[in-house]
């Protein structure tokens, strides 16, 4: 279990004296050039590094690995993550809808 993106932004704001509350950005920068962009890029790149580290670790144990990235925040990371991934922000909703359709057709 790892803190999510919004929790990371909130923690930097809530537990420091003066860091602003930032949110996700799709702009890809190596380093921020202001406090706001540094907070944003720090959170975003930290998550990318964490995910890529997990993928690398699992890939060493299992040669064939498929990575599926879901959830509302997935859209912010698809272009940032270098490993081949499948991303669908609405995968859970689509799955639940298929279950609903399946159960409706059984009756």
Language-model regions, residue ranges each:
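Glycine-rich phosphate-binding loop plus the immediately following alpha-helix
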Residues: 1-39, 45, 99, 103-106
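Adenine-nucleotide phosphate-binding core of ATP-dependent small-molecule kinases
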Residues: 25-66, 76, 84-86
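Short, well-ordered secondary-structure micro-motifs
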Residues: 10, 78-80
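Alpha-helix N-cap/helix-start and coil->helix boundary motif
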Residues: 6, 74-75, 93
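Conserved phosphate-binding/catalytic loops in two-lobed NTP-binding clefts
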Residues: 82-106
